[in-house]
Amino acid sequence: VTDFRGRGDEIHMLPLSFSEFSSAYGSNISDAWDDYFNYGGLPLVLSKQLPEEKEEYLLSLFKELYLTVIIERHNIRNVEEFNELIDILASSVGSLTNPLKLSKTFKSVKNKTIRDATITKYIEYLQDAFIVDKAVRFDIKGKKYIGSPAKYYFEDIVSEMKPTDVLLLENL
């Protein structure tokens, strides 16, 4: 966010598209696709040579930077449940997500009471940090939008979180 005489502009930069990534990659397109598929489109990934370096960079960026900042900024006390929610979202990319059902699942499986409003807030925190993006249904109208489940997609691919290649392709 830039600030000029009381006016602010927010610039939301998305990760590189595959076209941008492959242009900067410089090698054959198959190798570029493998790297993009496994490590995503963050520009700094291109400067890392070894798979271990790429994984370490992505993991530290996500866990040590993004999650730490979100947890501290929003004073999240249920850190374990917050991390589990991220795992749930990652494993259900492209599926409808209902915070009330997730709340009931935490109660029945983990014997933890987490209100659906809290789960909704946690997801909003991830959206505000540009980690996930929400896709609402286009086939419903009017009041049906209220309380309607949505799908969530990760802004970039984090290799630590990809449960299956099928879900990863859905996320692309």
Language-model features, listed with the residues they occupy:
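Acidic/polar active-site rim loop that often engages polyanionic ligands
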Residues: 2-6, 16, 38-39, 62-66
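Accessory nucleic acid-recognition modules appended to NTPase machines
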Residues: 51-172
